[in-house]
From Swiss-Prot:
Belongs to the OXA1/ALB3/YidC family. Type 1 subfamily. Required for the insertion and/or proper folding and/or complex formation of integral membrane proteins into the membrane. Involved in integration of membrane proteins that insert both dependently and independently of the Sec translocase complex, as well as at least some lipoproteins. Aids folding of multispanning membrane proteins. The chain crosses the membrane at residues 6-26, 349-369, 420-440, 457-477, 500-520. Keywords: Cell inner membrane, Cell membrane, Chaperone, Membrane, Protein transport, Transmembrane, Transmembrane helix, Transport. It is a multi-pass membrane protein. GO terms for biological process: protein insertion into membrane; protein transport. Interacts with the Sec translocase complex via SecD. Specifically interacts with transmembrane segments of nascent integral membrane proteins during membrane integration. This is Membrane protein insertase YidC. It is found in: Cell inner membrane. GO terms for molecular function: membrane insertase activity.
Length: 541
């Protein structure tokens, strides 16, 4: 009985420490929020950090152009015609604050912070590796809007080089989607062959800010190759060494809680995933595509995709079979994936994420009930053996070998497995941890209301009611557990303080996570009553 309590206590403390440590390990500097808007005119950017091809090094630009504004049902984007970079992206359907009209801004370029997506052509004849600097594209207008009844919106930019070659860069936006197609069309009207190579990169300022009392999640880079399905690449690691990974397909991304931006080149192309950190403190991660040779009179099309939006697993999987891994469930992903599917299934019926959390908690607890019953049955049997075990201790004294042998004979005679109460606990832990991470990583819970005073399941309870109720439920569970007379007094005190410790620990947790834990405790209390009633009938309590 004491060993089972020890394992339960150690297990709870270990899980708590593991979750806390995982958050701290994944913590990365988060840029300070700023209310500054994007500069009205697109100032030129130094292109020294644009990746080099076999020949040609980009030079600093000197042109200045007006930004091009693009509005769809999901995105509000601004494009710098100098190079054709996306320098601003607001997510129209995701608000900065609940109840406010201001959209969540993912990409921006302000005085103190840069987070933009660049793409271009490098190589011997690349327009972004010319001594004159990056190309200054021309557009037919500066404002583009996805009209009602229109499924796609094309934003064409054109550049004519000194040799007469026409380069067209087209941004294709889609209704209801956060991915943008970037298509280059090169019409070689010159008398000489051309050689170009497409690249795409994401640049973000490495700048720390004050962290909130809620434990932070990962913010930094990530990439995928044919050999490495998913790898985080922290800013501090990027500062130490540069990536240069050849691959077929692949992708490069910047991650933060709930949101992601990513370059996804064609899966059949030979690419190189690269990274660097510029002297100005900008972290860059991106890809270099294949080198194309374009004969005189020929036309070549080169394409890639860019995603800027929430960590929507369905949308991400449609772009790459590994991009959905940015929703990182850790080593228990194989459990978390079906749990997330079930959570989505319940929400599609009830229309409330809080109710869906309750339903999935009930489902998990229901499926684990046989293990829970086995656990408490074993604990009851061990409890009934305590007087006999105490007699063995008094009989054999310090002779541990004989006492151990006698205890094993007693267990065998009474048909009791001393580890029977521990194994169910150990089997349940992975499921509960996986469910925990599903609730933490699911962007769907952001700004999702429940009922009454809970208006956002992704933030802490403003009145701390749920954590207090959770603490009360733990106290009730503890009182329902019989305490063995032989239990160490220090251990008893530690167990008594557990509800208080967990209550304080959960004060700043997202209310969705606390709701899950509270409902789980309530169900556990009911299950204990049912199990104990059955044990009393068998004379085991």
């Amino acid at each position: 009985m004491e060993s089972q309590r020890n394992i339960l206590l150690i297990g709870l403390l270990f899980v708590s420490f593991l979750l806390w440590q995982q958050w701290q390990a994944d913590k990365a500097p988060k840029p300070v929020a700023t209310e500054s808007s994007v500069v009205a005119n697109a100032t030129t950017n130094h292109s020294a950090d644009v990746p080099e091809a076999d020949t040609g090094v980009p030079a600093a630009m000197t042109a200045t152009q007006n930004l091009i504004t693009v509005k769809t049902d999901q995105l509000d984007v601004q494009i710098n015609p100098v190079g054709g970079d996306i320098v601003f992206a607001a997510l129209v359907s995701h608000k900065l604050e609940q109840g406010k009209d201001q959209p969540f801004v993912l990409l921006e370029q302000t005085k103190d912070f840069t987070y933009i997506a660049q793409s271009g052509l490098i190589g011997r004849d690349g327009i972004d590796s010319s001594a004159k600097g990056r190309a200054a594209f021309a557009a037919s207008k500066t404002e583009f809007t996805l009209a009602d009844g229109q499924d796609t919106l094309e934003v064409p930019l054109t550049y004519v080089a000194d040799n007469g070659v026409t380069y067209t860069k087209v941004f294709v936006f889609h209704r209801g989607k956060f991915n943008v197609d970037i298509d280059y069309k090169i019409n070689n009207t010159s008398a000489a062959p051309l050689q170009v190579q497409m690249y795409g990169q994401i640049k973000q300022t490495i700048k720390p800010s004050e962290s909130s009392m809620m434990m932070p999640t990962y913010r930094g880079a990530a990439f995928s190759t044919q050999d490495v399905r998913y790898e985080k690449y922290k800013f501090e690691d990027m500062s130490k060494s540069n990536l240069n990974q050849p691959t077929l397909g692949g992708w490069a991304a910047m991650l933060q809680h709930y949101f992601v931006s990513a370059w996804i080149p064609p899966a059949t192309d030979s690419n190189t995933i690269f990274s660097s950190v510029s002297a100005g403190g900008l972290a860059n991660i991106g890809f270099r595509g294949a080198v194309y040779d374009i004969a005189p009179g020929a036309t070549q099309e080169i394409s890639s995709q860019f995603y800027v939006g929430p960590k929507d697993q369905k949308a991400l999987s449609a772009l790459s079979d590994t991009l959905n891994l940015v929703v990182d469930y850790g080593f228990l992903w194989w459990l978390a994936v079906p749990i997330h599917w079930l959570l989505m299934f319940y929400q599609s019926f009830v229309g409330n994420w809080g109710v869906a959390i309750i339903l999935i908690t009930l489902t998990v607890r229901g499926l684990l009930f046989p293990l829970t019953k086995a656990q408490y049955t074993s604990m009851a049997k061990m409890r009934n053996l305590q007087p006999k075990l105490q007699d063995l201790k008094e009989r054999f004294g310090d002779d541990r070998q004989k006492m151990g042998q006698a205890m094993m004979e007693l267990y065998k005679k009474e048909k009791v497995n001393p580890m029977g109460g521990c194994l169910p606990i150990l089997l349940q832990m992975p499921i509960f941890i996986a469910l925990y991470w599903v609730l933490l990583e699911s962007f769907e819970l952001r700004h999702a209301p429940f009922m009454l005073w809970i208006h956002d399941l992704s933030v802490q309870d403003p009145y701390y009611i749920l954590p207090l109720l959770m603490g009360v439920s733990m106290f009730v569970m503890q009182k329902m557990q019989p305490i063995a007379p032989t239990m160490d007094p220090m251990q008893v005190k530690m167990m008594q303080w557990m509800p208080v410790i967990f209550t304080v620990f959960f004060l700043w947790f997202p209310s969705g996570l606390v709701l899950y834990w509270l409902v789980g405790n309530i169900v556990a209390i009911i299950q204990q009553k049912i199990i104990y009633a059955g044990l009393e009938k068998k004379g085991l309590k």
